[in-house]
Amino acid sequence: MATPNSGRAASVYSEVQSSRIEHVLPLPSVLNHPFKIVQGPPSSAAGNPDEIAKLFPNLFGQPSAMLVPDVADSLDSNQQLKIGLVLSGGQAPGGHNVISGIFDYLQDRAKGSILYGFRGGPAGIMKCNYVQLTADYIHPYRNQGGFDMICSGRDKIETPEQFKQAEETAGKLDLNGLVVIGGDDSNTNACLLAENFRSKNLKTRVIGCPKTIDGDLKCKEVPTSFGFDTACKIYSEMIGNVMIDARSTGKYYHFVRLMGRAASHITLECALQTHPNITIIGEEVAAKKLALKDVTDYIVDVICKRADLGYNYGVILIPEGLIDFIPEVQNLIAELNEILAHDVVDEGGLWKKKLTSQSLQLFEFLPVAIQEQLMLERDPHGNVQVAKIETEKMLIQMVETELEKRKQQGTYKAHFKGQSHFFGYEGRCGLPTNFDSTYCYALGYAAGALLHSGKTGLISSVGNLGAPVAEWTVGGTALTSLMDVERRHGKFKPVIKKAMVELEGAPFKKFASLREEWALKNRYVSPGPIQFMGPGSDAASHTLLLELGSVA
């Protein structure tokens, strides 16, 4: 066990950081008064319920739980709990407040309880590497960004040996409960742990908390994942700044790639906040079966129309996962992986004859720098490293080539200069917004209540988020109800399905209704930095409010 000295020195904090530490967070009113937990109807699964039932015989079908007011507390306040918690996966603003919420619940409702933080993600559970979290240890991290209180990791508890290590740690620390703070993969893992512990009759219960800036872990009961609000506001501030720069110089097109490996939620939200000239949404590209040339032509068409209006500048938003949405690119990558696994690339290019005609055509269409990247950048398994392809730079080069053609045809007479940006890591550890700070604190407090009542295999759920905080609802949703199965290595594996951008959903429909106007008229919005007081300080994301029907 580590010595409980906090890793942060609040003495060197900025005035804003110091004021955030002392910021008192409101709680949903149900958590401020005596409550009891009521159960909902039996649950099913997001897909293939029969297979999920086989994989989770002890948990499948369990009802969701809801906290409702009561005349007196139904839980034993004298029960001293031992709770462990772990941060899993990439950072997201607000994680420290989930921890603060769990700690404060135990202080308020189960005095004398102990809270352990496992260091470095799930590996900390397997190695029994932990720190006891005290009021003094937690204090400098309240309302602060980052995961550095205990740090995170991407290990998974998957093999029988690893499950045994987790069981040993739970037994050694005599844990009543474990909270897994993570995204879709981490919460799938949390459910497997809960099932394993229950099958062995261990007393350790497991509760998940929904974390990911990508915004792709959500459902009716879990309206948003924490961190999305803050990350989008950080990116939108920077996009707004770039827009004013574009307008000021009048000569650059800024191509901005935004984090989000699968879903395009961040790109869509930032578009709604800032009104760029062009926004590519991966899910729409996939639905329309667009080729890379179609995407390029769309961008070039807008640039030409803007040039006719005298605008030789603009801002273009691109989701990080765009490549994954274009089937022809996926086919090319699959063919390259196969060829390069068996052949040496000869300089004469004879290896290209092994590509299908469609893939060869696409390969020749790509800029030389991207061709080289596809050939040379391999992961340890020998596969093309798609994540390393700088899509924004690739598109700039392809747009340049197409505009040159149009110049020669006489249909484009202006000058084009592209500037590339990637906004990613900047958004993962910022000071959480008032929304994320409060939402995370409530998620943590709810996780404490669910464990105190003996629940397991649920994800902490805070709803009615369009209303004032006092009216937010609090409960837990069966993790198995979010699950489907995927076939991997001939076996069914449980997965929480990522929530993708819905083209029939309110956020996309609003964007689609405005994008033509944004393309040709400069409707730029500069949201400015995140506010903690005054105008806009308590505003939730456009995506959340549109999905909840709280705004038109």
Curated annotation (Swiss-Prot):
It holds the Pfam family PFK. This is Pyrophosphate--fructose 6-phosphate 1-phosphotransferase subunit beta. Pathway: Carbohydrate degradation; glycolysis; D-glyceraldehyde 3-phosphate and glycerone phosphate from D-glucose: step 3/4. Substrate binds at T212, I213, D214, K251, Y252, M259, G260, R261, E320, Y425, E426, G427, R428. The keyword Nucleotide-binding does not apply. InterPro entries: ATP_PFK, PfpB_PPi_PFK, Phosphofructokinase_dom, PKF_sf. The keyword Transferase applies. GO terms for biological process: fructose 6-phosphate metabolic process. It comes from Ricinus communis (Castor bean). Diphosphate binds at G90. It catalyses: beta-D-fructose 6-phosphate + diphosphate = beta-D-fructose 1,6-bisphosphate + phosphate + H(+). The gene is PFP-BETA. Its EC number is 2.7.1.90. It comes from the Eukaryota. The active site is at D214. Its cofactor is Mg(2+). Catalytic subunit of pyrophosphate--fructose 6-phosphate 1-phosphotransferase. Catalyzes the phosphorylation of D-fructose 6-phosphate, the first committing step of glycolysis. Uses inorganic phosphate (PPi) as phosphoryl donor instead of ATP like common ATP-dependent phosphofructokinases (ATP-PFKs), which renders the reaction reversible, and can thus function both in glycolysis and gluconeogenesis. Allosterically activated by fructose 2,6-bisphosphate. The record marks K211 as: Important for catalytic activity. One of its GO terms (molecular function) is metal ion binding. Keywords: Allosteric enzyme, Cytoplasm, Glycolysis, Kinase, Magnesium, Metal-binding, Transferase. GO terms for cellular component: cytoplasm. The record marks D185 as: Important for catalytic activity and substrate specificity. It is an enzyme of class 2 (transferase).
